[in-house]
Amino acid sequence: MLSVIFHTMLQKIKSLILFRGESVDREVGKIFPPGHFYSPIPNIKEVRRREEKIFRVRTDNEVLGIDLNKEEQLKHLEIIGSYVDLFDYPETPEHNLKCIYYKNNGVFEKLDALAYFAFIIHYRPNRIVEIGSGFSSLIAMDVNKKFYNDKIEIALIEPYPSDYLRRGILFYRNAELIDQPVQDVDLSFFETLEENVISRNNFTPQSTTSRTQTPFQQAAS
């Protein structure tokens, strides 16, 4: 099943690059030409020249140079699935209470939130540190109150806190907001991180979650 999904995605990527790439070339190439070291756009002629090698489907489903740790990944997929029934948040804000997590928020939606929700419950961290905070923080604070009676220490590093985040902190009263850029946070704060800590960052659209000194560390990035 996973190989079928991967093959489908690969074909879509190939189509986007080979058949829509030239129009993108004309616009982006005004700054840096496609294929340039600083350009995120590949050189379409070069891609076509190496098409067979680039887009061939590997029969062993392995990625060279990267240990996907598939057994651990599948184990964590089972963990996430075991908490689906508890993940009962509304689709949209209820009763104008905009400090409770809701699924259709356009930022940190169902599957991301479910994974985070499940990992917090399952691994029972002593501490959670977020670098870049928002709807994920609402999940963390809610789980902390519902399942742990506010015993988890939560630190939210967010230089531009949204109104809903501030409302959430006031509502739950179980998290510390550090409203400054992460590079301005004293290093001594990070030196206190120890075993059984979950950390998240939102520097990229594909934000990451990790947990220190546990088997989960090997499966997360």
Swiss-Prot record:
This is Uncharacterized protein AF_0310. It comes from Archaeoglobus fulgidus (strain ATCC 49558 / DSM 4304 / JCM 9628 / NBRC 100126 / VC-16).
